[in-house]
Every structure is written in structure tokens, then in C-alpha cells.
Amino acid sequence: PFLAYYPMILVHNPFPPAPNSVDRNEQDNKKNFVDMVNYMDALVGRLVDTLEANGLRENTLVVFTGDNGTNEVLHSEFEGEQLRGGKGYTYDHGTHVPLIANWPGRIPEGQVNGDLIAFSDFFPTIVEAAGLPPKNVTDADGWSFWPQCEGRKGKPRDWVYGYYFPRPYSKKFDDKYNHWEVRYARDERYKLYDNGDLYDTQKDVLEKSVVDRERSSSAVKRARKKLQAVLDSYPNRGAQVDYSKVEGVYPSEMKR
């Protein structure tokens, strides 16, 4: 057995022409990004071809995913809209990424699943897919989504927890790569930050309008209570952060 981890830097900024680009233009970020994505697809195809050539295709789980949203200098079309990239931000354009799982003969073709999945779920999923004893995996944060891969219902997540403090020792904080420490919990619709701000991500994907606490429906109140319980179940500070060295200026105009 083997595990191969291949993090491509190809579609990362800056955005020069791809190796196979025609009409090369160093300044055309949008065209070059599209070329990069197409070239990345070709490289994935080479990996799959190599598995087939070595007789490993039918016994290999292939998982393809992104690690964050697109760079903000790019606008992509999605469902008829032009959306600015959200890399570095905590709203959906920065955290909601593609995930494809493929295993001929094991994962039925053509499935689309909208369950919540976090990166912490990958380890228990791979363990279950390999038929290995789970040991203490179920005591960790990850939930296996292998049953869903096989077309079964499984045990879908009811929430996802997020913690973001990328550069705790910055001299000045902002709402992006030097983001101030933030924690949140979310379900398929609502997202609650540790400062009490709740957002309806289906109606307000860019999180511009806080849900009014006083005018909330019973369903919204239940969601808030559930997500607050999730936040309360995790430490409220980063275990690896030396807070005596956190001296950056916190901009007062930030929402959170």
C-alpha cells in the first residue's frame, strides 16, 4: 500500500502563462489562470494514466481538492454570476472548495453530495476506505465520509468548526492574511462567530448583514444555540500561540 500527497503550486499566484499557453501574455491573469487549471487537469490525467499503466487504478482511491478559495485578483463565473476570489477570508469564497473522490468499482459514478466536510475528515475516511481498524480515530475531530462515497447515507456532519489566526505575531492585523484570531462554527446555512455575530450564508454569502438577534425565528434561535454549543466545546485560544508576543494593532473598523 502507498499514500501519495501531491500539493500543486501551479494555480497559485502569481499567474504567468502555463507551459502550454498560446498567445502568451504575462499580464493576463484571468486567461493564464484558466490555462493553469487546464494544465493542472492534464497533470492529474498523467497521474491517473500512470496508475493504469502499473495496474493500480482499480485499487487506488484518488482524492482531489483545493485548500482555499481563489485569489481575490480573479473573478470566476459561477451559476451565472461573476464572483471575486476569497482566498484568505473566512467567508465561503475563501473556505468552500471542490472535492472529488474517485475509485473505480468502489465509488459509484455521477454522485453529487452536499454534506459538510472538513479536512480533519480525510484521515478517518482513508482509514475506513482501507479497511483498517479505526483505533482512536473516532475520538478526534474527523468524521469519516467514506459511506457517502459508496453511495450510502453515512453520518453527515451537522456542523463544522473553524479557527483562523494565520500570523499571530503581525505588527498590524486585518481581515485577510493577517487576520485577527477568529473562531466560528457553521452548519449548512448558518455561521456563528465567537463574537456572537450570526450570518445566513444562503442569503448573505459575503456576510455583510448580521442576523438580528431580537427578530430571530425559532429555527434561527435553535441554530444559534447549537452552534454556540460547538464553540463552547473547543478551547477559546490557540494552543500553539504565545500570546505574550501578540502585539499587533487591531483595526477598530473591523467587523470581527
Each language-model region and where it sits:
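Long, internal low-complexity/basic segments
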Residues: 122, 168, 175, 192, ...
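Soluble non-cytosolic domains of exported or imported proteins
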Residues: 31-34, 38, 113-120, 139, ...
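Histidine-centered active-site microenvironments of extracellular/periplasmic hydrolases
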Residues: 14-17, 25-29, 49-106, 118
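C-terminal cap/loop subdomain of S1 sulfatases and analogous C-terminal strand-loop tails that border
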Residues: 70-90, 107-111, 115, 120-203, ...
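Loop/turn elements at helix/coil->beta-strand transitions in domains of secreted/extracellular proteins
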Residues: 1-4, 56-62, 96-97, 155-157, ...
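Beta-strand elements within well-structured catalytic alpha/beta cores of enzymes
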Residues: 2-7, 37-40, 44, 51, ...
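Short, solvent-exposed turn/loop segments enriched in Gly/Ser/Thr/Pro and often Arg
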Residues: 4-16, 64-70, 141-143, 164-168, ...
